[in-house]
């Protein structure tokens, strides 16, 4: 950790050099042994593939392999292998190979006896082999010999040898349309269809030694998914995920995760209303799901008699869904090579409008880094895959490949599509503020709660940014304290609010809140810092009652976002065992909406008889019993139409407003940039930066002022504001010239990952234009970023006619003008030599 006054953390910029064909920023770890100077920054100037771009690759010709669905695909090295499926008339057992480098199809070499023709089987890769399990076999044309299988075959990629594994002992029931994955040297099989019913059992088998292995049934626990088939599974963060699928009347759009370690299932709750994010995908079957980085990507399937073609993305860390917006060049077709843009080929350098159209996605912001235009295809066609089901997907490197499937009118497809992922280090904003809350460092306010006068400490900056009600309370307490100090003739120093004489920590501000108890108030405070609460045990009466108390506080404090979260949790937790307790508590707390939910739950036909026979029912208050009986006798009230839900503001939105002026009166530290003061908030700086945390803990300046630099370099005021935006609310969008100043900031200031640096690097690689090249040249010269300076001079030389008309050119330093002249002279000399050589 970099201490105050030191040269700061150090960076390994060369290690950050990403692939030359993708805008995917690498998630690299800190290397504190390297130089923190951008002098050693290595950049890749293209060509790039646009993130979130769909490309249509060459389809599989009929003479190589039939169009198909219900097949499997796996990825091995630089190839996609397709096995089995059906072409609408017959089942298949051929093995096709697609080379992603040269975009060529062929039949894979095979020896031995392959599996019988089949579909709805599973295929996984382990080591240098592919394993095929189960599926449906027989003659679909004559409708004979149709049966499910439970056989296991191995295909060795190196030799092309097919081998059937003969397993002794218990076997899984024969099945098709199941899920399969590999984890910890084992094949895991879940659910499927056995010909009579859907399943939800799980089996596993070791793949290291077929002579010693056997099938084992897994004893699952927790919230096991319902019996289902035609669903995908994916492994991410050492967990297996299952989304939707065919479950008869029980079909849902729930996402389940399986912990391999303790064999436990959990249904993941959705909080899209709370987070202001899109809802989960519709319930569906026949779709695909793959994992990349910390995300799950769901595509296609049949969703309530439709075939949607949106790509849905689930963030495993933040538990949110979103619809991925394809890049604009996906929609207008590929430039130059719509069917041959594979890994081995050079992607043409496009202008900004042609390449990204400034259609900004969540993970990328892009401007032009190219200087030449590519010819437009004569007949542009959409590169987006149409909706389909029973297709298959696999991941190679940083891209997803989708092949085949059933499209409109039950037509089989032979198309191959490629989707470019994006990958950036995750935003740690919520975690950083949560860490501040847990540590209780630098607390400057103490809330005195309830009749017991229990105390909970916090930070004025966070609380006043998130809650107007608590902000008023804190303001009133400060005014009372100021009046008291004035009466005692001891005014608070004005030049450094929040800093006591000699740099000592000022006394805590005491705020009394009589209507709140400590435990629910702590849950509320956790929400203010993180935008979420740690999920209690679902259905446990004590936890449900606690969240009801939190809900009551959220209503009193006008925290709409917390209201929605509490309601979602409580309504999802109500069951036959706790409904009466929850209903009685809701009536006592005057929580009318929750009370209505409980009453409607009780009077359901399938619940009522069980509820009234419980002992808890006998102990209910008479008015509540009467209300339940009357509710049962009368038709339930008509449900009003859905009203817009006020989800309030998020942590990011509140901290943005706080930095932009809403928190001005609560500033308690002054940052000096080249002598210019910028008021700020200690708690926020300490939460996001180990540099400031160490300073405020052990080296607090006596005058409450901190000089700002990054190593020996003083950033521009614009770059400094960009850094503050990142610190306060995680903003990474900034002008490219700011990125040169801030590239080393994550190491010097001890940010908790390299997200800012990854975006700075991408920004520099992609966002230099003729319009901003001179500003970036100045920044590169000041920061001694030699690689970027050379690139800027290269652009200036090749676009000098346009650059010469920019007013900024006349304000450059003499030395930079001489550098431009030298580069022009060198370019002209090289050009003349080339022309002379051509003449000779």
From Swiss-Prot:
Coiled coil: none annotated. Transmembrane segments: none annotated. GO terms for molecular function: small GTPase binding. GO terms for cellular component: Cul3-RING ubiquitin ligase complex; endomembrane system; Golgi apparatus; recycling endosome membrane. GO terms for biological process: negative regulation of Ras protein signal transduction; protein ubiquitination. Gene3D superfamilies: Kelch-type beta propeller (2.120.10.80), Potassium Channel Kv1.1, Chain A (3.30.710.10). Changing residue 688 to G: In NS2; uncertain significance. Changing residue 392 to V: In SWN2; uncertain significance. Kelch repeats lie at residues 79-128, 130-185, 187-238, 239-285, 295-341, 399-450. Substrate-specific adapter of a BCR (BTB-CUL3-RBX1) E3 ubiquitin-protein ligase complex that mediates ubiquitination of Ras (K-Ras/KRAS, N-Ras/NRAS and H-Ras/HRAS). Is a negative regulator of RAS-MAPK signaling that acts by controlling Ras levels and decreasing Ras association with membranes. Homodimer. Component of the BCR(LZTR1) E3 ubiquitin ligase complex, at least composed of CUL3, LZTR1 and RBX1. Interacts with Ras (K-Ras/KRAS, N-Ras/NRAS and H-Ras/HRAS). Interacts with RAF1. Interacts with SHOC2. Interacts with PPP1CB. This is Leucine-zipper-like transcriptional regulator 1.
């Amino acid at each position: 950790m970099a201490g105050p006054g030191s040269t700061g953390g150090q960076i390994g910029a060369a290690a950050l050099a990403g692939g030359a064909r993708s805008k995917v920023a690498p998630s690299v770890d800190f290397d504190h042994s390297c130089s923190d100077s951008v002098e050693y920054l290595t950049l890749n100037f293209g060509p790039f593939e646009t993130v979130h771009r769909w490309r249509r690759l060459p389809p599989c010709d009929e003479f190589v392999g039939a169009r198909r669905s219900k097949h499997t695909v796996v990825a091995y090295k630089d190839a996609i292998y397709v096995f089995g499926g059906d072409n609408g008339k017959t089942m298949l057992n051929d093995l096709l190979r697609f080379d992603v480098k040269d975009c060529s199809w062929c039949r894979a070499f095979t020896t031995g006896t392959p599996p019988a023709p089949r579909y709805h089987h599973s295929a996984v890769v382990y080591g240098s082999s592919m394993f095929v399990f189960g599926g449906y076999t027989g003659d679909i044309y004559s409708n004979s010999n149709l049966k499910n299988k439970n056989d296991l075959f191995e295909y060795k990629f190196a030799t092309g040898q097919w081998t059937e594994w003969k397993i002794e002992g218990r076997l899984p029931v024969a099945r098709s349309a199941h899920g399969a994955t590999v984890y910890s040297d084992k094949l895991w099989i879940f659910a499927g269809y056995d010909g009579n019913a859907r399943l939800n059992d799980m089996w596993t088998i070791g793949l290291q030694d077929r002579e010693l292995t056997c099938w084992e049934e897994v004893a699952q626990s927790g919230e096991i998914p319902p019996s289902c088939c035609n669903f995908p599974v994916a492994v991410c963060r050492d967990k297996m995920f299952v989304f939707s699928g065919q479950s008869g009347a029980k079909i849902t759009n729930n996402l389940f995760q399986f912990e391999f370690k303790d064999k436990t299932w959990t249904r993941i709750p959705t909080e899209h209303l709370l987070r202001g994010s899109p809802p989960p995908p519709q319930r569906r079957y026949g779709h695909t799901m793959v994992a990349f980085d910390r995300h799950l990507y769901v595509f296609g399937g049949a969703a309530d008699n439709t075939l949607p073609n949106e790509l849905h993305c689930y963030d495993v860390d933040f538990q949110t869904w979103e619809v991925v917006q394809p890049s604009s060049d996906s929609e207008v077709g590929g430039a130059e090579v719509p069917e041959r843009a594979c890994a081995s080929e050079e992607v043409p350098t496009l202008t900004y409008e042609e390449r990204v159209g400034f259609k900004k996605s969540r993970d990328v912001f892009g401007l032009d880094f190219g200087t030449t235009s590519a010819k437009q295809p004569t007949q542009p066609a959409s590169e987006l895959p149409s909706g389909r089901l029973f297709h298959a997907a696999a991941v190679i490197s940083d891209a997803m490949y989708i092949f085949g499937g059933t499209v409109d009118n039950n037509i089989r497809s032979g198309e191959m599509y490629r989707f470019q992922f994006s990958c950036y280090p995750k935003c740690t904003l919520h975690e950083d503020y949560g860490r501040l809350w847990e540590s209780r460092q630098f607390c400057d306010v103490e809330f005195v709660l309830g009749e017991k006068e229990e105390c909970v400490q916090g930070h004025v900056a966070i609380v006043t940014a998130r809650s107007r009600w608590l902000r008023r309370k804190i303001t009133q307490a400060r005014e009372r304290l100021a009046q008291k100090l004035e009466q005692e003739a001891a005014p608070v120093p004005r030049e450094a609010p929040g800093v006591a004489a000699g740099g000592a920590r000022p006394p805590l501000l005491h705020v009394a809140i009589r209507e709140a108890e400590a435990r629910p108030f702590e849950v509320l405070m956790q929400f203010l810092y993180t935008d979420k609460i740690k999920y209690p045990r679902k259905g446990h009466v004590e936890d449900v009652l606690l969240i009801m108390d939190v809900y009551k506080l959220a209503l009193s404090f006008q925290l709409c976002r917390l209201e929605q979260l509490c309601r979602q949790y409580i309504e999802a937790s109500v069951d036959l065992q706790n409904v009466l307790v929850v209903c009685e508590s809701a009536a006592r707390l005057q929580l009318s909406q929750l009370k209505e939910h409980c009453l409607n739950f009780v009077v359901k036909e399938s619940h009522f008889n069980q509820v009234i026979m419980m002992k808890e029912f006998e102990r209910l208050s008479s008015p509540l019993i009467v209300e339940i009986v009357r509710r049962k006798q009368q038709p339930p009230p008509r449900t009003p139409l859905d009203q817009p839900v006020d989800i309030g503001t998020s942590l990011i939105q509140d901290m943005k407003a706080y930095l932009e002026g809403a928190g001005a009166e609560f500033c308690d530290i002054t940052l000096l940039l080249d002598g210019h003061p910028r008021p700020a908030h200690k708690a926020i700086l300490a939460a996001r930066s180990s540099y400031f945390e160490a300073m405020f803990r052990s080296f607090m300046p006596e005058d409450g002022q901190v000089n700002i630099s990054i190593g020996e370099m003083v950033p521009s005021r614009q770059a400094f504001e960009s850094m503050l935006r990142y610190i306060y609310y995680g903003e990474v969008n900034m002008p490219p010239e700011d990125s040169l100043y801030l590239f080393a900031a994550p190491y010097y200031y001890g940010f908790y990952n390299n997200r800012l640096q990854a975006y700075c690097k991408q920004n520099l690689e992609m966002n230099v234009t003729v319009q901003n090249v001179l500003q970036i040249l100045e920044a590169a010269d000041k920061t001694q970023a030699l690689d970027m300076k050379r690139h800027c001079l290269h652009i200036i030389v090749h676009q000098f006619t346009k650059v010469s008309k920019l007013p900024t050119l006349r304000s450059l330093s003499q030395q930079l003008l001489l550098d431009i002249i030298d580069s022009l002279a060198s370019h002209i000399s090289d050009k003349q030599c080339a022309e002379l050589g051509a003449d000779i």
